[in-house]
From Swiss-Prot:
Homotetramer. It comes from Koribacter versatilis (strain Ellin345). It is found in: Cytoplasm. GO terms for biological process: argininosuccinate metabolic process; L-arginine biosynthetic process; urea cycle. This is Argininosuccinate synthase.
């Protein structure tokens, strides 16, 4: 009986040539698993291409709702951003795809799983850590670490030799990844960090020059830290993110150019477009500023850094990530209300925020006397706060006097 290998298949250059390569080198049946996380491809065309390339079976998993509610929304609630800029679009999409791939492998009686990630990137860790956490009995095959192909140009030659049609060419050599949260762009002119992205690099958002010459306002409503409405209209998760992506993209929101530190120790340069996610993150931050006490807010910011690092490194299926999620969930109970954002040519400004759970009290915050806050109380507070500083100064001054004598 021939071995069955389940491949995470996208229809791109790498996975398109992996199907015939696996069959040639492992004498196996290849089951192509297509995880739909909102990449916008013609799924029927991707399925047809997998069959044409040699897949014995193609299984499509609609992961869009799961991706949003179980991965993207927790990231927004956490406030997770990697190295100040990256909203983890690709990092968040890999765990649900790998999970679905393992489920298919076990259901189909496969002995191995495979992916198209290079040996230099983060995705190999994200997929393989998930495989080991969920089904350690499955063999892992990583063609990029085995075959003799050394570059994307070599992959193009292999595709041409095997009659495989791909969208990439030597002139269009960018590596792109798209889902409901973002589009990433790597390779080509971007490999030189001193090169500005070409106008043709960006595929989703308008440039600031092309964006409207007027401000557009959008109000995002939250319940329990989760976005639930736009401009007062309740929406299901998929409809909500699609509308925010549309609004953000036409206003040039969410373009990011980043030199980042990969988990494997390599610095890389990528350009990302995250229109709707950027709006969600900005609105959620403003609502937390209203609703969280100082100590919780500040500590949560530390948690967000660690959470982002874990997810970027591919360590989704870990006890620590689950524990951090539990902490974040406890902070989100009172994150309810609405934030109005004003969008203009790539800029996001806050135009208003309101919450029934707000800790902000105008009567206390104002410069007016009274309202339950006696300004004289500040004197004792400041003296106690300054006690260590006064003590240190007295000791240091006493030491200086002895030296001068």
């Amino acid at each position: 009986m021939r071995e069955k290998i389940v491949l995470a298949y996208s229809g791109g250059l790498d996975t398109s040539i992996i199907i015939p390569w696996l069959k040639e080198n492992y004498s196996c049946d290849v089951i192509a698993m297509v995880g739909d996380v909102g990449q916008g491809d013609d799924i029927d065309a991707v399925v047809a291409k997998a069959h044409k390339t040699g897949a014995s079976k193609v299984i499509v998993k609609d992961l869009r709702e799961e991706f949003l509610t179980q991965y993207v929304y927790p990231a927004i609630s956490t406030g997770a951003v990697y190295e100040h800029k990256y909203l983890l679009g690709t990092s968040l999409a890999r765990p649900p795809i790998a999970k679905a791939q393992v489920e298919v492998a076990l259901a189909e009686g496969a002995t191995a799983v495979s992916h198209g990630c290079t040996g230099k990137g983060n995705d190999q860790v994200r997929f393989e850590h998930a495989f080991q956490a969920l089904a350690p009995e499955l063999k892992i095959i990583a063609p990029w670490r085995e075959w003799t192909l050394k570059s994307r140009e070599d992959c193009l030659d292999y595709a041409e030799a095997h009659g495989i049609s791909v969208a990439q060419s030597r002139e269009k050599i960018h590596s792109r990844d798209r889902n409901l949260l973002h589009v990433s762009h790597e390779g080509g002119e971007l490999e030189d960090p001193n090169n500005a992205p070409l106008d043709t690099t960006w595929t989703w958002t308008k440039s600031p020059q092309e964006a409207p010459d007027r401000v557009e306002e959008v109000t995002i409503g939250f319940e329990g830290g989760v976005p639930v409405s736009i401009n007062g209209m309740k929406l299901e998760p998929l409809a909500l993110i699609e509308l925010l992506n549309e609004i953000g993209a036409r206003n040039a929101i969410g373009r990011i150019d980043l030199v980042e530190n990969r988990f494997v120790g390599i610095k890389s340069r990528g350009c990302y477009e995250t229109p709707g996610g950027s709006l969600l993150l900005a609105a959620h931050r403003e609502l937390e500023a209203l609703c969280l006490d100082r100590d919780t807010l500040h500590y949560k910011q530390e948690v967000a850094l660690k959470w982002a690092e874990l997810v970027y490194f591919g360590l989704w299926f870990t006890p620590l990530r689950e524990s951090l999620d539990a902490f974040v969930a406890s902070t989100q109970k009172n994150i309810a209300g609405a934030v109005k954002l004003a969008l203009y040519k790539g800029n996001i400004a806050v135009a208003g925020r309101t919450s029934p759970k707000s800790l902000y009290r105008p009567d206390i915050a104002s410069f007016t006397m009274g309202a339950g806050y006696d300004q004289k109380d500040a004197e004792g507070f400041i003296r106690i706060l300054g006690l260590p500083a006064r003590s240190r100064a007295l000791i240091e001054n006493a030491g200086k006097e002895k030296v001068s004598k």
